[in-house]
From Swiss-Prot:
<dbReference type="Pfam" id="PF19246">
    <property type="entry name" value="DUF5894"/>
</dbReference>
<feature type="coiled-coil region">
    <location>
        <begin position="89"/>
        <end position="132"/>
    </location>
</feature>
<feature type="coiled-coil region">
    <location>
        <begin position="3"/>
        <end position="35"/>
    </location>
</feature>
<feature type="region of interest" description="Disordered">
    <location>
        <begin position="96"/>
        <end position="121"/>
    </location>
</feature>
<protein>
    <recommendedName>
        <fullName>Uncharacterized protein L531</fullName>
    </recommendedName>
</protein>
<dbReference type="InterPro" id="IPR045413">
    <property type="entry name" value="DUF5894"/>
</dbReference>
<keyword id="KW-0175">Coiled coil</keyword>
């Protein structure tokens, strides 16, 4: 009777604790069965040596120390068990507090990162909206990859503005790496930079190199960018020019149908994950007086 009451109460307390613990392991049920089996054996052993007082079961936060206390006191070890019981409870409370604090900090960190991400996305969109080019004005926005270009194209379409990709020396160069092994092209951010040559030439160290992210094992030494190294590095468009009237490169140069990308002009969700990028707003006439087309892009006239 006493044994069954204790087991029942212990299981109820354990179920309450399990509800407070997040991310419960999938094998917890099997683990619970093992615990119950061990508890039954322990309680049976204690009860066989010194019968357990049923009144003990009314105590709040009952544990095995309470069941073993009469047995310990009978042999002069009660003080030791009380001290050990206090220390175990204290350690349990500390672990629970630390776990709750970790969960709280992790949740706050996730919320903060989410807020910062959403804030940055909104900032880029708000920046563009607050710098909408009027007649005779253009906005030149730095774009480092195809996803960012798509976002700026969509914004321009949304406001019925013309847009065109270009390469201009207002911003740092953007590179595309074409792998001759698998035929895929990737932007710089997608490439895998490494300095461990052990998988290529064990024991050798020649500096950093990059590998194709498609795992075709093609690589290139970053110091010389040998065009015959299996991966070709090419300068790509690094900006988008947007306005009612814009300077135009040839369609052959841009390799795209003028002003059409097959995008939904209302889908501004493409700004998700788009970071804040540098931009400049200027008069179209000033642009023609300061920049000149060269090598499929634009350069400052006084820098030639």
């Amino acid at each position: 009777m006493v044994k069954n009451q204790y087991i029942s109460q212990n299981m109820e307390n354990k179920e309450i604790e399990n509800k407070e613990i997040e991310n419960k392991k999938t094998d917890s049920k099997e683990f619970d069965k093992e615990i119950v089996s061990c508890l039954i054996k322990i309680v049976e052993t204690i009860d066989s040596i010194k019968p357990i007082d049923p009144e003990i079961l009314n105590k709040k936060d009952l544990d095995l120390f309470d069941l073993m206390m009469p047995l310990a006191e009978s042999c002069g070890m009660g003080w030791y068990y009380k001290q050990l019981q206090t220390e175990c409870k204290s350690n349990k409370e500390i672990k629970l507090q630390n776990k709750q604090q970790e969960n709280s900090e992790e949740k706050n960190s996730e919320e903060k990162n989410s807020e910062e991400k959403n804030s940055e996305e909104k900032r880029m969109l708000e920046i563009l909206n607050s710098n909408l080019p009027t007649e005779g004005k253009i906005i030149i926005v730095n774009a480092t990859n195809g996803k960012e270009r798509k976002a700026f194209y969509t914004w321009a379409d949304y406001h019925n503005l013309s847009h065109q990709p270009t390469r201009i020396d207002l911003f740092d160069d953007t590179f595309i790496f074409k792998c001759e092994e698998c035929g895929e092209s990737n932007y710089d951010d997608d490439m895998r930079y490494q300095s461990d040559w052990s998988t290529i030439n064990p024991g050798a160290c020649y500096g950093s190199f990059i590998k194709c992210p498609n795992y075709c094992d093609t690589f290139i030494h970053t110091e010389d960018y040998d065009p015959y190294g299996g991966i070709k590095r090419m300068i790509a468009f690094n900006a988008i020019i947007i306005g009612h009237d814009i300077p135009k490169l040839s369609r052959k140069t841009t390799k795209r149908k003028h002003n059409k990308q097959g995008l939904s002009s209302n889908d501004l969700s493409v700004f998700n994950d788009t970071p804040v990028r540098d931009f400049i707003v200027m008069d179209l006439n000033d642009f023609h007086s300061k920049f000149k087309s060269k090598d499929n892009g634009y350069v400052k006239i006084n820098d030639e």
